[in-house]
Amino acid sequence: MDDMSLKKGKEFEERASKFLKKQGYKILARNVRYSFGELDIVARKGKTLVFVEVKGGNPDFPPRMRVDRAKLRRLELAAYKYIKDFSPKFEESRLDVIEVLSNGEINHLKGVGRW
């Protein structure tokens, strides 16, 4: 990934984090990396642990379309690993996608995996 893409990705993640905070989420971690995948944002709201994949781009081709089955599987594995490593005691967990669009719009898609 080139420097420009990394910079944009970080910008999208920052905007998504601010959005989540305004919605009452507490950010627990960002950019949790494992050999098989990365969790962009780990947050909690109440008793729910939320793993968030952030995608940014043009509204003409929704960024969520870049989250395919293989990507979802890697995210699920990373989420399971995070839970195992840090043993948080949450009643629920879920996998979300946040789209940060070039027109300024932010879409929060909740519960996108097989969770």
UniProtKB/Swiss-Prot annotation:
It comes from the Bacteria. It comes from Kosmotoga olearia (strain ATCC BAA-1733 / DSM 21960 / TBF 19.5.1). Transmembrane segments: none annotated. GO terms for molecular function: nucleic acid binding. Pfam families: UPF0102. This is UPF0102 protein Kole_1919. Belongs to the UPF0102 family. InterPro entries: Restrct_endonuc-II-like (IPR011335), tRNA_endonuc-like_dom_sf (IPR011856), UPF0102_YraN-like (IPR003509).
